[in-house]
Design a protein with these regions (language model features):
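N-terminal basic, amphipathic alpha-helical segments
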Residues: 1-129, 334, 338-345, 354, ...
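Short beta-strand "wing" residues that participate in macromolecule-binding interfaces
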Residues: 57-58, 166, 426
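Short Gly/Ser/Thr- and Asp/Glu-enriched loop/turn motifs at secondary-structure junctions
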Residues: 61, 168, 395-399
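Conserved core segment of the aminotransferase class I/II
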Residues: 124, 301-370
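Conserved core of the PLP fold type I
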Residues: 138-273, 278, 284-300, 372, ...
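Conserved glycine-rich beta-strand-loop-beta hairpin in the small C-terminal domain of fold type I
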Residues: 370-380, 391-405
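AMP-binding (ANL) adenylation modules
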Residues: 432-436
């Protein structure tokens, strides 16, 4: 975090604590500069950031004042999906989303990429170079099928933060969380099996289920507490469900952290109905609370929770490193990995291992938690300012996604097509539902820095939504 960001955070905390009251004049630029031992330009940048966040307002020749408090947009209500098994479609829309990744002229508000421009990632660049220069023969050869042991040992230590006690021998490395989840499903399911999912559910997971020939049943999900335990139990009574996919920590796209009591309740249901829990923890390290939230896997005593994660969101997607703790399905999963993809890339494993071992990983993740939290606050302010009344916005407890529910008459599928012509990519809510629900919703990627350029995009998005309401 830069000096001006640190100062802005400090001032924001003082405002939230009531030390500076709404309408009160803030200290002058010069006095703050002297108080904190920073330059005048640093104070000016901090005030500009707080102005962007609509926490303060400038008055000509008078200085800065604390802005009047504005009401937060309400949180969306619990989802109400169709509760019956369905086959997934919408591949064409997803393919359009994926193609936009490679077009540098498109602004990817609908994507899921993290911010890989931060200086705290410089050590991983050095480690990648070093891995190739000093281990040439090693990086050109096959690796262990389960993945490099040193990296598995480092990951096992990281998992302790989420309450999971495992050893390197309990883990299998993959080419990402998507790959880990796919292998987990292959190890347990047969084509035609039914898998329960949260609703809304990440579209990549939906398309994975489609590709494996599986049916899905969407379960109502609360944007603050997670999947409805009662609705899941009802579905388990009615249908031969094989397992449930959950993102309980910093959920994508809703951003909630499921309370511990509800995590244990889901695990109790899984034990009673003898189903598998496929736990996706890819965003868990990006929780704003500390210590980070526990995984469902941390309470598992009979190996029925298959925990999947990766460095895709915390370090960089280009590393292509994920992992899975497959529990009782270890042997089957290793067989599936050999059949599907074989071994991992040695060079990126070496680099990631050293990045963690030397302490760079924790420093980087701490930095990104703060940046993403501040980004989401700014984007929420922009939504309040540039979008019509009547919207609902999630209040994520981590990660970097916002889920926005718009008035019923807005069709974000049509709006997204119009924005595409303006070189703006949006992710309509219908992508996150097997039944095509949530057409009046949109997911926004707040990993994109809140620059003037991206502010202008939010203005255009708000204008397009207003036109769609006419």
């Amino acid at each position: 975090m830069t000096r001006y960001q640190h100062l802005a955070t400090l001032l924001a905390e003082r405002i939230e604590q009531g030390l500076y009251r709404h309408g009160e004049k803030l200290p002058s630029v010069r006095s703050l500069s002297q108080e904190h031992g920073v330059s005048i330009s640093t104070v000016q940048q901090a005030y500009q950031l707080l102005e962007q966040q609509q926490m303060i307002v400038p008055q000509p020749r008078s200085g800065y004042f604390v802005a009047p408090r504005k009401a937060q947009p309400p949180v969306p209500p619990m989802s109400r999906p169709v509760q019956r098994p369905v086959e997934i479609t919408q591949w064409d829309q997803v393919l359009t989303m994926l193609d936009a990744r490679y077009d540098k002229s498109i602004i990817p508000f609908g994507g899921g990429s993290p911010d890989v421009t931060q200086p705290s990632l410089k050590p991983i660049w050095r480690e990648l170079s070093r891995a190739i220069q000093h281990n040439l023969t090693e990086v050109l050869n096959y690796d262990e099928l389960a993945g490099r042991r040193e990296l598995r040992e480092q990951i096992a230590r990281l998992m302790l933060d989420g309450g999971s006690v495992v050893t390197a021998d309990d883990l299998v490395l993959t080419s990402g969380c998507h790959s880990a989840l796919s292998l987990a499903l292959l190890s347990v399911c047969q084509p035609g099996d039914i898998i329960a999912v949260e609703s809304p559910c990440y579209y990549g997971t939906m398309q994975m289920l489609r590709g494996l020939g599986l049916k899905t049943i969407e379960i109502p999900t609360d944007p603050e507490t997670g999947i409805s335990i009662e609705a899941l139990e009802l579905a388990l009574d009615q249908w031969p469900i094989k397992g449930v996919i959950l993102v309980p920590n910093c959920n994508n796209p809703l951003g909630f952290i499921m309370p511990d009591a509800r995590k244990r309740a889901v695990l109790n249901l899984a034990q009673r109905y003898d189903i598998v829990i496929f736990e996706d923890d890819i965003y868990g390290e990006l929780a704003t609370e500390y210590p980070r939230p526990r995984t469902i896997h941390s309470w598992d005593i009979d190996g029925r929770v298959m925990l999947c994660s990766s460095f895709t969101k915390t370090i960089a997607p280009g590393l292509r490193i994920g992992w899975i703790a497959p529990g009782r399905y270890y042997d089957k999963l290793l067989q599936m990995k050999y059949a599907a993809s074989g071994t991992n890339v040695p060079s990126t494993q070496l680099a990631a291992c050293n990045f963690i071992r030397e302490g760079h990983y924790h420093r980087h993740v701490r930095r990104m938690r703060q940046i993403y939290q501040r980004n989401m606050e700014i984007y929420t302010c922009w939504l309040r300012e540039f979008f019509p009344c009547g919207i609902c916005v999630t209040r994520p407890k981590g990660g970097f996604m916002l889920w926005v529910e718009l008035p019923e008459q807005v069709d974000m599928v049509c709006v997204a097509k119009q924005l595409c012509r303006l070189k703006i990519q949006a992710a309509p809510g219908s992508l996150f539902s097997a039944a095509g629900k949530y057409r009046n919703c949109v997911r926004i990627n707040c990993a994109l820095p809140p620059t003037e350029k991206h502010k202008a995009v939010m203005v255009k998005l708000g204008e397009a939504v207003k036109v769609a309401m006419e």
